């Protein structure tokens, strides 16, 4: 999720499709809390958890990343972590993110930042954790990368 002048979800090689979604080139537009909730639910199952890692950034950094994501285009299957790590490495303050094809390695590299906040969602229902996450989402600074 990039929260800049507009809030989008970059879903590289993503499979989340619905007729009501505004999607172009693996970018889901209008990432309001309902869409974010649906996105988390879509990717979280009894054998897969979803971890959200957040870093607050300046408006300039968020806008720069947003523009690069929008111009990136659709990503081939199996290149999701590679595309995210490449885009982050081009972002001021994120140059030390490891280049990788592996989502777990990307998550570990991102977690090495001192300013990362993280929450993990499991199924079937993380109601309390989700309520706390959305309360926090409403209080955090406007510009960030999740």
Regions found by a protein language model. Give the residues of each.
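Glycine-rich catalytic cores of cysteine/serine-nucleophile enzymes that process amide/ester linkages
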Residues: 1-48
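Residues in flexible loops and secondary-structure boundaries
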Residues: 18, 60-65, 118
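Activation targets extended, charge/polar-rich intrinsically disordered C-terminal tails
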Residues: 67-146
